[in-house]
Each structure stands twice: as C-alpha cells, then as structure tokens.
Amino acid sequence: MHGRLPLTAQTHRRLVVKVGSAVLSGPQGRQHQLAIAAQVAALRAEGREVVLVSSGAQATGMQKLGLTEKPKSMPGKQALAAVGQPTLMLLWEQAFSWYDLKVAQVLLTAEDLAHRHRYLNARQTLETLLEWGIVPIINENDTVMVEEIKFGDNDQLSALIASLVGADLLILLSDIEALYEADPRTHPEAQPIPYVERVDAGVLRMAGDSPNRVGTGGMKSKLLAAEKAQAAGIPHLLLPGTRPQSIAEALQGAPVGTLFAGGQRRYSGRKLWLYQLPKPQGEVVVDAGAAKALRQGGASLLPAGILEVRGQFGVGEAVRCLDEQGNLIGVGLVNYSAAELARIKRRKTREIEALLGYKNTDEAIHRDYFALASELE
C-alpha cells in the first residue's frame, strides 16, 4: 500500500479536470454537474487555476431529442453534438454562475493541435483566459471531426491539454471509480489500486472494456491518458465523478480513486508535442543512407534521401519516416507538401527551386522537428 501525500495549491496549482459523459448523463447528471462546479469553485478559492474538459455534447443532444441510442453514422453523431453542445455550455455557465465564475467555450480538433502554429495559438488563448480568471471549458469539435484524425475520446484530449497548458495535475472524473486489480464486474473480490508508479504493459493489461451508451472512453483510454501525462511529468488522478467531494478528498491525500505518478518528464517542447500527436496520416520511405543518418541522430532529412511519398499532407504536418523494409524510423514535420515532395524526391537540394519554382528550405524535415521512434515509445 502506498501512502498518498496531500497535493497542495503550492505544488499543484494548475489543474486540468476532465468530466466524462457518463457522469453528466442520466437522472443524476445535473446534480453531478452542480457538485463538480462547486468543487472547481473551491479549488479556485484555494488559489488554483482550473481548465475543464467536458464531454457530454452528444449525450446532451440525445436527452434533448429523446433518443436512447446514439446514431451509428458520423453525420448523425455530428448533428447530435451540434444539438447538444449549446445546452451543455449553458448548463455549465449556470452552474458556475452560483460562484460568480465566468466560463469560456473552446472547441478543438486533433488537426488543430497537429499544427504547431495552431497549437501555440491555442496555448496563448488558454493562458489569457486563465489570467482573466475565467474557467475554460474544452470539448472536441465533434461537428467537424473526421474519424481518421479525431482524438478518440476526451481522455486523450485532456492529457494533451494538460501538456499544452503545463498543468501540475490531470484529474479524470468518471463513472469508473478507480483502477482495479481485475474487472470488478466479473471479479467482485477485485480491490482498487490507490497508486500506480508507472503505466507499463502490465498495468495496461488490467484494463477491461467498460462500454456505455453515452461515452467512448473506457479504462484503457484512461490508462493511455495517464501514459501521455507521465511522459510530460504530470501526475494523474482517476476519481469517481459521482462522489461530491472526491477531488478535495484526493488532494488531501485520502485513498480515493487511483493516483498515477508523474515521474520524470521524458520529453519537453517540440519532442513532447510530437510524442502526443494524433497518428500521422502521411509517410515517406527513405533510402538506407538517410535511414542510417536519421537513426544516428542529429541529421535532417533531405529530398535526395526520399524514395517514396504516401498519403496526402500539407506543409507543417507530421509524417512517419520508414526505411525500405517498412520499419518506423521516427516522426517529423515536413517543410513541403506531399505533392511537392513527390516532385523533388531523390533530387539534390540545388535542384529544388528549378523543379518547384521556389525553395522553402533545403530540408524535407529539419532535425529540430524530428523525433526517433525510440524516443516516442
């Protein structure tokens, strides 16, 4: 048993709190929402900053339309989110108004955070909102998402946001009370695990499927979020969102839920951003010489080393670099689009301008914007 210490406002000032759909839906959903607003207000009164990541647009849309099952088609889900998101924000605004706290809606897509410039713009906006004393409420922009580049669920989004704003702690409020030794639905004797030092393969195996009709994130998703947070050195609390004072109790050191240690920060800056990117859609295959130079570290990828370009991508997007055997070398940001690279592959840098009519840079991928696969594990 690991004794948990208090997480004070002095050491854990900036928090990201994610609320799951299952907590906000159902007959008790509004009561849970009001209780969470009260807890956030109490955190603010302690001098902490809070960014809220709220699921529930589709679940709220289901309630408004009287549906019992979520549509299976992507357009149906997007329309449902469009119906539910305004009401979800109104409910949050009303809940926080009891404590004279103002809120701001921030809708993001995976594509927003996959572009470095937009990523930094999002950070600046959130920093400004926090400086103004406003509670940012973030959700994935479901109405414009596409399956190939969506976050997957708000557990993953919350981990990215925690990294984006440099949070001291990530809190996931869920209908899942804690990480258990085994699935408590099929193993009633299973005990909750109060503390996890590191999310490894053994811990991931503890995750069972926990589907529900309104949400998308089960235990595996929460463990993957914890893994992302650990890479940034951010501790993560998994707490029961239906328990009125679960945040306060956990921050005081009570064995509520599961605390995942932050550990040593493995990445920072651009490398951390590359590690947390959604799966890149494009690929470039490089020759043996380029593969060796990239793997040894410190080298940029030049067009001459590119043998093949796969997929569609634009300037500044992330692509996977593969060797001729199909092994992943790493992930980097391209200085040319897929169409441009297809024209200048296997060519010398001095030929770029003649082939394209212009030259952005000599490098297809600069070494400062490339992370080896071994760094991303």
UniProtKB/Swiss-Prot annotation:
Its main location: cytoplasm. Substrate binds at S55, D142, N154. Residues 281-359 form the PUA domain. One of its GO terms (cellular component) is cytosol. Its EC number is 2.7.2.11. GO terms for molecular function: ATP binding; glutamate 5-kinase activity; RNA binding. SUPFAM superfamilies: Carbamate kinase-like, PUA domain-like. ATP binds at K18, S174, D175, T216, G217, G218, M219, K220, S221, K222. GO terms for biological process: L-proline biosynthetic process. This is Glutamate 5-kinase. It comes from Meiothermus ruber.
